[in-house]
């Protein structure tokens, strides 16, 4: 390496240590450069220091200080952003990007903030959440081709390929780039780092518009009406057969399981939960429930207070 290249490399190293975001800005215009999937993950990993899936607290303060100070042409340090400026900035920033208003930034919210390769951005499905968990379970069954109860790397790659094909972008994506996207999505969503996606991890990659069962009416706050129960039944009985079965039942149980297990459950948990629920309603019909049985389940759920769920 010649002396000029060595000096340039050292300068980048110093910039990284001083302000991680500065390397991603154009030195002339100070605009953010378009990030590759790998660069985006570098930014995420740098600021999500505890690896809990959120940029929050002091991590968020550090990100905002560096994000703002890196836009300045003069080499000011992040510390130049005063606490008062930081609070004002945080308030505006969170109003614009904290979609779920939880006071922290998750990976989807960061993806909306930073300029990224268009194809990679498409994979986050910002404008296209699934209608229901029934749809989710149909997709799960389609891509879990070996019925292992997990979406492995090759199955995830097939899913991402089809997602881009659906968006008519597949011709733009090479096999190498698809592998990069698959690896990146695993880094993002594979919380337990076992190299594959379990149900709860895939549910974060493929969000559902709303888990209807999370509404307060099902948590004992108000009396359940016949209309409430009918609404739930029609939500899951997608084929209007008069019973909730197959992926409809799996989707219903997934939504129920999310109330109990929160963010960490897999296909084995779902199967065990199904067995418990079916035994609880005393049904001998394997893999399907009627309106009456759904009513029993929802009435039981409504009796459980939020404190009991913890």
Curated annotation (Swiss-Prot):
The keyword Isomerase does not apply. Ca(2+) 5 binds at residues 237, 239, 241, 243, 248. Keywords: Calcium, Metal-binding, Repeat. Ca(2+) 3 binds at residues 144, 146, 148, 150, 155. CDD domains: EFh_HEF_CBN (cd16179). SMART domains: EFh. GO terms for cellular component: cytosol; dendrite; nucleus; synapse; terminal bouton; type II terminal bouton; type III terminal bouton. Expressed in a large number of neuron of the brain and the thoracic ganglion as well as in two small muscles of the thorax. Ca(2+) 1 binds at residues 48, 50, 52, 54, 59. One of its GO terms (molecular function) is calcium ion binding. Residues 35-70, 84-120, 131-166, 177-212, 224-259, 283-304 form the EF-hand domain. Ca(2+) 2 binds at residues 98, 100, 102, 104, 109. The keyword Calcium applies. Ca(2+) 4 binds at residues 190, 192, 194, 196, 201. Belongs to the calbindin family. This is Calbindin-32. The gene is Cbp53E.
